[in-house]
Amino acid sequence: MTLYDVPAPAKLNLFLHVVGRRADGYHLLQTAFRFIDLADTLHFEARADGAIGRAYELPGVAESDDLVVRAARSLQRATGTRQGAQIGLHKRIPQGGGLGGGSSDAATTLIALNRLWGTGLSRSQLMQLALPLGADVPVFVFGQSAFAQGVGEDLTAVALPPAAYLVVQPDAGVPTAAIFSDPDLTRDCASVTIADFLALLTSCFGRNDLEPVVLRRYPEVSGAVRWLFEHGLRVRMSGSGACLFAEFPTLPEAVLAQEEITATMRVAGKTTSHTHPGFRLVQASTGLTEHPLRNWIAS
């Protein structure tokens, strides 16, 4: 087969603790990753000329900075293959929202081209290629819900119960580097264990240490959190934001909450005495047990 159309799922950080900082400036984290069925779609078609062609545009992202292109070229260098690919991308995951869209696209590129080109790298080999592309890329190659430590490379699979999520996107762009460099960021959270996390397994476990910084710096995000709480929805930020999520036991409950919030927003928009901050409901999504392409890699 010479072409694939494959998904690149979003991730949520169910909690995110900053427990320290290395001498090189990288932060030491503890977090739990879960994939959801909100996903980008990538199209790969083999080329015999060795070129990597990008059949899409990402606003503000040059081809040399595109993680998809970088992932493809990294795999070429590592394997010595002379094959190339024409790559298409349909974005559904909000860019820069803390949902790992770019990282997921890069991981799907490594997985799909490893199969398309027949380069035969193992999961651990692909994960070694993934880490230089970004701290979140390895977990998508790992392919399971995971408890992560270090800078994101120390991953342990965890079994999570079924759950659904409503994802909210505030009208704010949050630069990750600025949040991690903020002097008010707490960097000494007490470490937790996997057992601590698995004993509770609720959306109330721990916290996101980046969230207070984002709420202080971005009124669009703090306003969305406040408005949603006032209307019965308790949310948490994923990653460095700005996207927020609420957890539900089942997808129908998440869909119902989405419909109720949408109706309330519609009424508020028509009534001058009621306002709500700018945000959109991205999608009611199901939590996944594993990455859709997990079985494409030899362990």
Curated annotation (Swiss-Prot):
The active site is at residues 11, 136. It comes from Bordetella parapertussis (strain 12822 / ATCC BAA-587 / NCTC 13253). Belongs to the GHMP kinase family. IspE subfamily. Catalyzes the phosphorylation of the position 2 hydroxy group of 4-diphosphocytidyl-2C-methyl-D-erythritol. It is an enzyme of class 2 (transferase). It catalyses: 4-CDP-2-C-methyl-D-erythritol + ATP = 4-CDP-2-C-methyl-D-erythritol 2-phosphate + ADP + H(+). It comes from the Bacteria. This is 4-diphosphocytidyl-2-C-methyl-D-erythritol kinase. GO terms for biological process: isopentenyl diphosphate biosynthetic process, methylerythritol 4-phosphate pathway; terpenoid biosynthetic process.
